[in-house]
Design a protein with these regions (language model features):
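N-terminal periplasmic/intermembrane-space "pro-region" immediately following the signal or transit peptide
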Residues: 26-181, 471, 580
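Surface-exposed coil loops of outer-membrane beta-barrel proteins
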Residues: 143, 177-193, 225-252, 258-341, ...
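Hydrophobic, lipid-facing positions within transmembrane beta-strands of outer-membrane proteins
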Residues: 148, 162, 198-203, 246-253, ...
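Short loop/turn motifs that connect adjacent beta-strands in outer-membrane beta-barrel proteins
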Residues: 149-164, 177, 210-214, 258-263, ...
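Residue-level signature of outer-membrane beta-barrel architecture
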Residues: 157, 170, 205-209, 255-257, ...
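Glycine- and aromatic-enriched membrane insertion/assembly motifs of diderm outer-membrane
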Residues: 161-172, 184-224
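Outer-membrane beta-barrel pore domains and translocons
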Residues: 169-173, 219-221, 268-272, 320-323, ...
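Outer-membrane beta-barrel pore domains
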Residues: 190, 227, 236-241, 347-355, ...
C-alpha cells in the first residue's frame, strides 16, 4: 500500500507540473492569435522536460529501493538462515546518482515543490535501520562431519509448528565366539548374534511455536528392553516406571527466551552427551563405540538450561534424577552440565561433568563424580578430491566413587579404590564427496569396583537385581576390570538419509567377561532368580554364595552351572540405518 501511495503522489505531482507549467504561455497569447512566443518562453519547455525527466528517474529509483527493502525484510524460511540487508544512506544514494542529487544546475529544482511531509515520510522509511536476524547458535558452519551429529542437511517437509523426524536402525552380528544362546554381553548397542534385529524405530520430531518447544522420539525395538535394563533406580520405591518410559528415548518440553543468543529451559527425558557418541547410531562414525561411551549415560531425566552467550558457546547445567536414571536411586538428585565451544569451523571442544549424585542402589552414602572431555578436529577438507575429508575425535574420562566403604584413591581409611579412567580415539576418512566413509579407532578403560561396567545379562540379570547380588560376575568394591578394544568401520552412503555399514570389532578384558561358546543362559532357560546360583539340572539352587549352592545342587544329584565367559571377543556387525 505504501508503495502504491508513493507512486500515486509522485505521478500526481508530475502531471500537475506538466499541465500547469505551460499556462503562463497561453495567458500571454490569449490577447492575439497571431502573436509569436518570446525567446524566454521558447527556453522554458526544454527546462521543464529536463526537470520532469529527472523526477521520473527519482521515482524509479525510490520504487526500486522500496522493493529491495521489502525483500530484505521478508522472514527466513529456515531457522538459522540470515538474509543480510543494509539500506543505502541518503548521501550514498545521491552519490550513486548525481542527476537525482541535483535536478537543475542552479539547485533551484521544481522537485522542491514536493510536500515536505511526503519527502520526510519517504526518507524516514528509506533510512530506517534494518536489523538482520540473529544467528542461531552453531548455524554458521557445516557441522555434519562431527562424530555424534547427523549428516542430513535437508528436510523434505517442515512447518512453522512441527519438524518431523523418523529413524530406523537394523543390524546383523556374526560373533566369532559363536554363543549357543546367541546372547551378547558388554554392549549397549549389540545384543544378539546370528539374527537380524531392529535396534530402534523412532518416530517423532520437534514442536516449536511462539517460543514454546517440545520434542518426542520413540524407541521401538531392542532399545526399549536393553536401555531400561541398565538403570538400577526402578528398584527404589514403587510404580513400574520402566513400563512407563521404555518406549521413549526423548520426551521433553520447554521455553525459548530471546536473550543473549538464546536460552532454552527444558524438562523431561533428554539425551546425555557424556561419551561423545550419539545414542542414535546413524549419527556416529562407528556402530560399537568404545567403553568410555558405551558404559556412560545415554539419557537423563530432569531439567536442563541451555545458555548461548555467543553463537559458538553453550553452557548447559543439569538438574537430574541421577546417572542414566528414570528414578533417583537414593535420596539426592544429581547435578552436572556441559560446556561446548566451537572457536573455528574445524574444531569442537566439549566438557561434560557430573557430581553430587548417589547412584548406587541401597548404598545411600556413596557419591559419584565424573568428567568427560572431548575434542574433535577436521584437519583435512578438499571437497573435490577423492579423499575429501579427514577428522579425528579424542575423548578422555575420569571419575570415582567415595563413601559407603570405597574411596577414590584406595586408602585404608576410606576403603578399596573405586575409580574410572579411560580414553578413546577415532579417525574418520570420507571419500568421493562423502559417498564412502572409513573409521578406525578404539579405546581403553580401568574401572576397579566395576561400577560402570555393563553387567552381562547372565540368567536375566539386570542392574536392579545386581544391586542385591550378581553371583557370576561380581561388582564388589575393588574388583578389577581392565579392557581395551579396536574397530574398523566402512560406510556406504548413497543418500544423506541412509547408511549401509560394515564393521569389525575386537575387544579384550583382563577377566572373563564376554560370552563364549557355551552361552550365558542356564540349561533350562532363565530361572527367574538371577541373584542365585543355578544347578546344571536347570533349577535354582536357592543360594547366593557358592559353597551353599554346591551343597544345594549336590543334594539333588547335580552340580553348579556356570556361564561360559571369555577374555576376548571379535565380531562383524552389518547394519542399515535410516534418518529423515
Amino acid at each position: 500500500m505504501s508503495k502504491f501511495l508513493m507512486q500515486s503522489n509522485w505521478r500526481a505531482i508530475a502531471c500537475s507540473v506538466f499541465i500547469l507549467a505551460p499556462l503562463p504561455c497561453f495567458a500571454q497569447t490569449s490577447g492575439t492569435a497571431n502573436q509569436q512566443p518570446s525567446a524566454a518562453n521558447q527556453q522554458a519547455s526544454p527546462e521543464i522536460l529536463k526537470e520532469l525527466e529527472a523526477m521520473r528517474h527519482r521515482i524509479d529509483e525510490l520504487e526500486a529501493e522500496l522493493k529491495a527493502q521489502k525483500t530484505a525484510q521478508a522472514p527466513a524460511d529456515r531457522p538459522g538462515f540470515v538474509s543480510a540487508a543494509f539500506p543505502l544512506k541518503t548521501a550514498d544514494r545521491n552519490a550513486a546518482n548525481p542527476e537525482s542529487s541535483s535536478l537543475s544546475p542552479s539547485g533551484d529544482s521544481r522537485a522542491a515543490d514536493i510536500s515536505p511531509a511526503q519527502e520526510a515520510a519517504v526518507v524516514t522509511k528509506q533510512t530506517a535501520p534494518i536489523i538482520p536476524e540473529q544467528k542461531q547458535p552453531f548455524s554458521d558452519a557445516d557441522w555434519t562431519w562431527l562424530n555424534g551429529n547427523p549428516r542430513t542437511k535437508e528436510i523434505f517437509w517442515d512447518t512453522k509448528f512441527f519438524t518431523p523426524e523418523i529413524r530406523a536402525d537394523m543390524n546383523y552380528v556374526v560373533d566369532f565366539n559363536h554363543p549357543i544362546d546367541h546372547s551378547i554381553g558388554g554392549s549397549s548397542e549389540l545384543f544378539r548374534s546370528s539374527e537380524v534385529h531392529l535396534e530402534q524405530f523412532g518416530v517423532g520430531g520437534d514442536f516449536h511455536y511462539d517460543n514454546v518447544r517440545a520434542r518426542l522420539m520413540t524407541q521401538f525395538g531392542m532399545y526399549s528392553a536393553t536401555t531400561p535394563r541398565n538403570d538400577p533406580s526402578p528398584g527404589h520405591g514403587q510404580w513400574d516406571v520402566v513400563s512407563a518410559y521404555r518406549y521413549v528415548s526423548e520426551a521433553y518440553g520447554g521455553y525459548h527466551f530471546d536473550v543473549l543468543h538464546g536460552v532454552n529451559v527444558d524438562a523431561g527425558i533428554f539425551l546425555s552427551y557424556i561419551g561423545l557418541f550419539s545414542y542414535y547410531n546413524f549419527d556416529n562414525w562407528a556402530y560399537q563405540p568404545s567403553y568410555v561411551s558405551s558404559n556412560t549415560p545415554w539419557f537423563f531425566n530432569g531439567v536442563r538450561v541451555q545458555i548461548f552467550p555467543t553463537a559458538h558457546l553453550k553452557i548447559e547445567p543439569w538438574f537430574i534424577n541421577g546417572w542414566q536414571a528414570y528414578f533417583s536411586a537414593n535420596h539426592r538428585p544429581g547435578l552436572g552440565g556441559q560446556i561446548k565451544w566451537t572457536p573455528r569451523p574445524w574444531i569442537n571442544i566439549i566438557s561434560n561433568n557430573y557430581g553430587l549424585g548417589r547412584d548406587d542402589l541401597f548404598i545411600p552414602n556413596r557419591r559419584r563424580i565424573h568428567t568427560d572431555d572431548s575434542i574433535e578436529v577436521k584437519y583435512f577438507d578438499r571437497p573435490d578430491s577423492t579423499l575429501d575429508k579427514m577428522a579425528f575425535s579424542l575423548t578422555a574420562d575420569a571419575g570415582c566413587e567415595y563413601g559407603g566403604g570405597v574411596s577414590c584413591y584406595g586408602n585404608k581409611a576410606g576403603g578399596p579404590k573405586q575409580s574410572f579412567l579411560g580414553f578413546m580415539l577415532y579417525n574418520r576418512f570420507w571419500f568421493h564427496r562423502d559417498l564412502f566413509g572409513l573409521t578406525v579407532g578404539g579405546g581403553k578403560i580401568n574401572n576397579p569396583g566395576r561400577y560402570l561396567v555393563l553387567l552381562p545379562p547372565i540368567n536375566g540379570e539386570t542392574a536392579v537385581t545386581a544391586s542385591t547380588n550378581s553371583p557370576y560376575f561380581t561388582e564388589n568394591p575393588g574388583d578389577p576390570f581392565k579392557a581395551w578394544d579396536s574397530s574398523i568401520t566402512f560406510d556406504y552412503m548413497p543418500k544423506q538419509y541412509i547408511t549401509f555399514r560394515w564393521e569389525y570389532d575386537y575387544r579384550h578384558a583382563n577377566v572373563p567377561y564376554w560370552t563364549g561358546r557355551g552361552g550365558i543362559t542356564p540349561p533350562s532357560g532363565n530361572t527367574g532368580f538371577p541373584t542365585q546360583f543355578v544347578c546344571q539340572s536347570g533349577v535354582t539352587s536357592g543360594a547366593t554364595s557358592l559353597p551353599d549352592a554346591q551343597t544345594a545342587c549336590s543334594a539333588i544329584g547335580s552340580t553348579v552351572w556356570f556361564p561360559d565367559l571369555r577374555r576376548n571377543e571379535s565380531f562383524i556387525d552389518m547394519s542399515i540405518m535410516v534418518k529423515f
